[in-house]
């Protein structure tokens, strides 16, 4: 009798520990799964109208650090199908970039933004590469960007040129900019002939 009671007493805490360990393991597995989803490499796609507010918020949050020009929500909504967005495993927009037409042969990358937590992971380069492919597929010969940090884009094949080499940009935007005569941005251009003719991730209208 005593031996059986001792056996039951020993078994009870062991069973409890087993159940606890089992629950803890299940919780840990669930947490790891959520972590894997959050860390999953963002997917690129063409923005849709419902993305406009999130893109606007992303640009506003990074306006100072990224030296970004302000954008109105109404403008973004009107031009939403020019944007490519990076979406993480939870469906949040963590990056964006716009392919803006300047002429029949020249397009510009605008509002290139990567959220702070996603920087340093190559997402900006993925966006630029995707915008290059889309520009080539749309029939443009050259792609330009105006940047405060030219080295970043130089590593992706862009070259610094005089602003006057881009009269389309000057006519479209620069003349109305309050910093027109004291612009601190570098004008940069890349020739799209070297970009492979592959299908873009999703259709982009420009």
What are these regions (language model features)?
Residues 85, 92-101, 105-113:
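Conserved beta-strand in the GNAT
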Residues 137, 141, 147-175:
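Conserved active-site alpha-helix within GNAT-family acetyltransferase domains
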Residues 7-12, 16-18, 22-23, 30, ...:
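Short, low-complexity intrinsically disordered segments enriched in A/P/G/S/L with frequent Arg
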Residues 51, 105, 148-149:
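A generic "binding-loop/recognition-motif" signal
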Residues 71-73, 172-178:
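Short, P/G- and charge-enriched loop/turn segments at secondary-structure junctions
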């Amino acid at each position: 009798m005593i031996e059986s009671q001792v056996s039951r007493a020993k078994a009870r805490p062991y069973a409890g520990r087993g159940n606890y360990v089992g629950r803890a393991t299940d919780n840990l597995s669930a947490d790891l799964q959520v972590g894997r989803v959050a860390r999953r490499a963002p997917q690129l796609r063409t923005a849709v109208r419902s993305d406009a507010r999130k893109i606007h918020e992303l640009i506003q949050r990074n306006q100072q650090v990224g030296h970004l020009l302000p954008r109105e929500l109404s403008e973004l909504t009107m031009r939403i199908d020019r944007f490519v967005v990076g979406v993480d495993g939870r469906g949040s927009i963590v990056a964006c970039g716009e392919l803006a037409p300047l002429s029949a042969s020249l397009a510009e990358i605008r509002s290139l933004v990567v959220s702070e937590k996603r920087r340093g992971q190559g997402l900006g380069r993925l966006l630029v590469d995707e915008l290059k492919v889309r520009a080539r597929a749309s029939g443009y010969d050259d792609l330009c960007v105006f940047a405060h940090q030219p080295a970043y884009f130089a590593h992706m094949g862009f070259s610094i040129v005089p602003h006057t080499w881009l009269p389309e940009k000057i006519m479209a935007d620069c003349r109305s900019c309050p910093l027109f005569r004291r612009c601190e941005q570098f004008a940069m251009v890349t020739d799209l002939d070297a970009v492979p003719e592959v299908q873009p991730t999703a259709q982009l209208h420009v």
